[in-house]
Every structure is written in C-alpha cells, then in structure tokens.
Amino acid sequence: MRPSLDSYAHLAGGKVRDLYTIDDEHLLLVASDRISAYDHVLSTPIPDKGRVLTAMSVFFFGVLGGNNHLAGEPDDSRIPEEVLGRALVVRKLDMVPVECVARGYLTGSGLLDYNETGAVCGVALPEGLVEASQLPDPIFTPASKAELGEHDENISFEAVVEKVGQDLAVKLRDDTLDIYGRASNFAADRGIILADTKLEFGLDPQGNLVLADEVLTPDSSRYWPADGYEAGKVQPSFDKQFVRNWLTGPESGWDRASDTPPPPLPAEIVEATRERYIEAYERISGLSFADWVG
C-alpha cells in the first residue's frame, strides 16, 4: 500500500516542482504538469509533462553516473500512487545558491548580454556572433537564484566566488562544463544539438558536491534538431516553443509588457507541446515513453 501525498509535509514549491518531507534524510521531489513562460506560471497544464521531466532526469542521471541526489527507484514504495512517474525520492542536501549554466551556443539571455557588452557573464567572446552561433568553446555562465516570479540574474564567475568561495566555485564550473560536454556529445550522436543547460548542485552532510534537481530536461536545456541548424535565426526547439510563440503572437491577445497574467492555452497548443516533450525524451533516450512508470 503506497502512502498518500497528504501523509508528507509540503516543504516548498517552485514554478514546476514541489518538495515534500519523507524523513530527516529524504525528500519527495514532485514534478507537476505546470508550465511557465516569461516568468509566469500558466493556468493551463501540459498533460504528462511532469512524467517526461522525471523520466528524462532519471535517464541522464544514469548516463552521467557520479554523485547525484537519487535515493530510490522511480517506482519506490515511498512514492504515492497519485504522483507515481513524476516523483522521485531524493537525498536532503544543502543546495548551492547558484544556477550553473553551460552554453555552447549563443541565444536567449546570453545573446542579449553579448549584444550589450560583447561578453556573457563577464566571459569575453569574439565579435560578429549572431543568434544561435556556436561558441569557440562552451562557457560557464552562472545565474543567481531568483524568488518565484522574479528573473534569474546572470552573474560573473567572480560573483560565484564571493557567494561560495574559490574552491567550490571552481568545482561548480568544472563539473558543469564536464556534464555539458558529455551530454552535448551524447545528444549529437542522436542528431540533436544541446545549445545550453542549467544544472543545480547541493552539498551532502560530508561536504561532497552532489548533482541535484532536474538534469538535462527540455525545461532546463535548449535542445535543437541538428538537421536544418543555421546560425543567424531562431532554431526550432524541443521545449515550450509552441507556448512562447502563441503567447507573443496576435492570437493570444496578451501583452507581455503588461501586468496581466497570460491567458489559458488553446487545446492544440497544449497537445503540440505535450508531443514535443515526449519526442525529446524518445529521440534522446531511445526509449518509449509508453514504458515509463505511472
């Protein structure tokens, strides 16, 4: 008999995930079907999104090996039935207050930063780069963790040193770039470009650095089809692209600059987004989503 979710105390909630306390050493990390865009959590969920994020994280924790926060299998008996397939039993960690971002291509906030300063997070880059340009080498572009509803703010490596100290800052940078490099090669073998990814780490009671939260999902990473890649234009991606395009297009009637929340998503955008998430999982993992637990 599996426990009820009500039997665990709710510890914290973010845009997409919720944390519950299992015991002194373990947490239940639950991925919801909520979707966020432009710093808003939308009122319309995407069916199966939480399961895809969980399946993708479990897959890549396995590929990467090393020290991660998993403390049970995806069907662990401590996971309640109502969240089976989108929840994981994880170790309780002291989370590092830095979003660890690796970029191999220039897009998003990195492109904005580059266009203003010629650098990203203080890392100088060559002149003449454009949307989706491949960088000479992947770079570490950390961000400070923002409160719910606020923007993560890109920060320099020196700012990370001030936050956590030199030794830990160097390890965060090195581990982030190592993981990005291995995952990028893995995706490339499957015809997919990993443009960038965001990782989070925590410290265990012994002070060891542990890979935590989600890893290499369509929410934390930009995946582009390698077929048709061309620098200088926005690439199609395996994530919330349909949602973003609809919200900023005339059909939604929503003004991004206003204080009003985004409108509900139409059914066709919901289904297209669901299919895109599942396609990302299946193409990258080589597994069938139909076989995932839950």
From Swiss-Prot:
It comes from the Bacteria. One of its GO terms (biological process) is 'de novo' IMP biosynthetic process. Its EC number is 6.3.2.6. One of its GO terms (molecular function) is phosphoribosylaminoimidazolesuccinocarboxamide synthase activity. One of its GO terms (cellular component) is cytoplasm. Keywords: ATP-binding, Ligase, Nucleotide-binding, Purine biosynthesis. InterPro entries: SAICAR_synt/ADE2_N, SAICAR_synth, SAICAR_synthetase_CS. It catalyses: 5-amino-1-(5-phospho-D-ribosyl)imidazole-4-carboxylate + L-aspartate + ATP = (2S)-2-[5-amino-1-(5-phospho-beta-D-ribosyl)imidazole-4-carboxamido]succinate + ADP + phosphate + 2 H(+). Pathway: Purine metabolism; IMP biosynthesis via de novo pathway; 5-amino-1-(5-phospho-D-ribosyl)imidazole-4-carboxamide from 5-amino-1-(5-phospho-D-ribosyl)imidazole-4-carboxylate: step 1/2. The keyword Lyase does not apply. It is an enzyme of class 6 (ligase). The keyword ATP-binding applies. Belongs to the SAICAR synthetase family. This is Phosphoribosylaminoimidazole-succinocarboxamide synthase. The gene is purC.
